[in-house]
């Protein structure tokens, strides 16, 4: 069965509740790191997990009750998630560990897992019903830091959906919490990986010493694409055939040293740039999220669940990007990623404090986050691993439409690959799909028609 975006169903929700830690936890104030309270992380990010009811030992268990108890027990260890965010002098964010709890919704849907189709991928039908935006709950300050909805399906399967205040954790961090919930739900006494706060590691130096030219945070005048009310959401699957087609267009000296993600990113950057039709003389940016945990000496602790990534930017003009071979974009991306070191992370923290915690550049910017190894699909609440686990949609963020994710997926033929949800204005989406199709089929792209002739 194919992915059915036209699927419609009813969801019956119970009244939202707050789940508090199962035991009393300390009331204290914990500062976020100076990397975390930047403007570009002050938004809510949605995650969704689909679970098949095929475990006979769990036949009589209610996933809502099992997960509710798992959350309460996990919050004893991850108690800052049960608190509320406050802002103090200098726009500094601090968690007040109040123990108020995370928001939880119990729900039932009159649909089966099979009706979603064999290829579960964003955008998901009726998503706003599977992760309900409780009025008044979505603020960055003074609001629940997590909202979780568990929806039973009429076939016995269920959906776990979560909304995270991104200032609190990155993909690796929220997966640690979700795995802890799963372990506690399955009866563990403690999480296998104990959480570590240690946000001071990523604090600014005194005085701040910005040692890199952080082009990802440059102030650029201009506008990003509009209108926001005409954004289209689509997903594209990349298996071995598609990746091989891209690699054939790369110079031999880059084929062996470039990762699949880097090759894919170079291709998508060009296609998306053609789609948004900037002036060829305008700068365009490709921001790649780089997990910096291993860049430190010693590496950050395994249980560190805060944001620990950099967003280096590859920068060139639209004309150069689209008129040069794919290897040109690839080398820019690889060079930007190589910049990320421990010193680079300290420099980012220093920049945040010195310049008022700015948003990253969004004009003519595309940002991709690779969650293929984050472990969303491995989260097990007792019913086995998720049949889909990961970000719920592309285009999330303070500025809609800038961000995409690389998500692991097995397609209808059973082939493992990567799915990319992307968000663009409807007209731009058609151009993107055409450019991508031409690239994968080795067809020449008519660059000139995507730019104004007078500017070429």
From Swiss-Prot:
It catalyses: benzyl alcohol + benzoyl-CoA = benzyl benzoate + CoA. Inhibited by magnesium, calcium, cobalt, zinc and copper. GO terms for molecular function: acyltransferase activity. Keywords: Acyltransferase, Transferase. Highly expressed in stigma. Detected in stamens, sepals, petals and style. Bearly expressed in leaves. It comes from the Eukaryota. Optimum pH is 7.7. Its EC number is 2.3.1.196. Induction: Up-regulated by wounding. Expression peaks 6 hours after wonding, decreasing afterward. The keyword DNA repair does not apply. Pfam families: Transferase. The active site is at 166 (proton acceptor), 380 (proton acceptor). Belongs to the plant acyltransferase family. Monomer. Probably involved in the formation of benzylbenzoate, a minor constituent of the floral aroma. This is Benzyl alcohol O-benzoyltransferase. It comes from Clarkia breweri (Fairy fans).
